């Protein structure tokens, strides 16, 4: 069986380097292209060297069109604006678009929806199996408990994290809202400061923290005299590339 040819965009980033390593270790796929933004110091370098490995014979390019044309799929953990552009380009050439980019707004998601009409698009706020299992558990618990139980989504990430709440936190919040048969945006509360008054029944709170960890997430269901906590701890960034 032939190997799946994959392009990694944002190749010099944390997840980009992790993905390049993961592809090298998977016999079912091969790195056919590596893309970085124009002006990046990584452009022209061997993608293997960029990822901290031996040479792989694939040079990092700033021309995604040519890289996509020779691929079966693109792995994308970049920025919302870049992801929107890559999605349109992937649709043009007819390849799979796997999206782990976080911090996207409706305008960005609309581009993914449009692309999904013609190509397979896989998108998640977090690609780890553990977080997605946690989301399923959160949905079930939220469905069982009544609205008198307060829900808080707590998280900690490395200090270079640029979006908050994270995609994983929003995924968990959406799972809690789904369990309560409601919409997250109608009950979302991010951060509290000053005199806020009593908590509104049914709200779902978010409290992001800085640190040096890959990603810790905890969902707390706080009731009268009892508390239920469900959590997931990411110990290695490579789990997002599995």
UniProtKB/Swiss-Prot annotation:
Binding site for (S)-2,3,4,5-tetrahydrodipicolinate: 158
Keywords linked to the UniProt accession: Amino-acid biosynthesis, Cytoplasm, Diaminopimelate biosynthesis, Lysine biosynthesis, NAD, NADP, Oxidoreductase, Plasmid
Primary subcellular site in the record, as a coarse category: cytoplasm
UniProt enzyme class: oxidoreductase
Catalytic activity: (S)-2,3,4,5-tetrahydrodipicolinate + NAD(+) + H2O = (2S,4S)-4-hydroxy-2,3,4,5-tetrahydrodipicolinate + NADH + H(+); (S)-2,3,4,5-tetrahydrodipicolinate + NADP(+) + H2O = (2S,4S)-4-hydroxy-2,3,4,5-tetrahydrodipicolinate + NADPH + H(+)
InterPro entries (alphabetical): DapB_C (IPR022663), DapB_N (IPR000846), DapB_N_CS (IPR022664), DHDPR_bac (IPR023940), NAD(P)-bd_dom_sf (IPR036291)
Record-listed NADP(+) binding positions: 37
Biochemical pathway: Amino-acid biosynthesis; L-lysine biosynthesis via DAP pathway; (S)-tetrahydrodipicolinate from L-aspartate: step 4/4
Residue positions of the active site: 157, 161
Xref: Pfam families: DapB_C, DapB_N
Subcellular localization: Cytoplasm
BP term (GO), one: lysine biosynthetic process via diaminopimelate
EC number(s) on file: 1.17.1.8
A GO cellular-component term linked to this record: cytosol
Positions contributing to NAD(+) binding: 10-15, 36, 100-102, 124-127
GO MF terms held by the record: 4-hydroxy-tetrahydrodipicolinate reductase
General function of this protein: Catalyzes the conversion of 4-hydroxy-tetrahydrodipicolinate (HTPA) to tetrahydrodipicolinate.
Family: Belongs to the DapB family.
Protein name, UniProt field: 4-hydroxy-tetrahydrodipicolinate reductase
Organism for this UniProt entry: Rhizobium meliloti (Ensifer meliloti)
């Amino acid at each position: 069986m032939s190997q799946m040819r994959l392009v990694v965009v944002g190749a010099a980033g944390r997840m980009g380097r992790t993905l390049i390593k993961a592809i090298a270790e998977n016999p079912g796929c091969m790195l056919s292209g590596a893309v970085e933004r124009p002006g990046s110091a990584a452009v022209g370098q061997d993608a293997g060297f960029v990822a901290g490995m031996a040479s792989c014979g694939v040079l990092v390019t700033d021309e995604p069109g040519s890289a996509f044309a020779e691929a079966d799929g693109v792995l994308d953990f970049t920025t919302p604006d870049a992801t929107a552009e890559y999605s349109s380009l992937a649709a043009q050439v007819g390849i799979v678009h796997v999206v782990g980019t976080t911090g996207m707004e409706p305008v960005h998601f609309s581009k993914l929806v449009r692309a999904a009409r013609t190509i397979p698009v896989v998108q998640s706020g977090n690609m780890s199996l553990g977080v997605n299992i946690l989301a399923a558990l959160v949905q079930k618990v939220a469905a069982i408990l009544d609205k008198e139980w307060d829900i808080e989504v707590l998280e900690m990430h490395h200090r270079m994290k640029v979006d908050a709440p994270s995609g994983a936190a929003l995924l968990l919040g959406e799972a809690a809202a789904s369990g309560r048969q409601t919409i997250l945006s109608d009950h979302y509360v991010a951060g509290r400061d000053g005199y806020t008054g009593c908590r509104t029944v049914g709200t779902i709170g978010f409290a992001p923290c800085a640190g040096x960890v890959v990603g810790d997430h905890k969902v707390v269901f706080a009731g009268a005299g009892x508390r239920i906590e469900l959590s997931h701890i990411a110990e290695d960034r490579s789990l997002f590339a599995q």
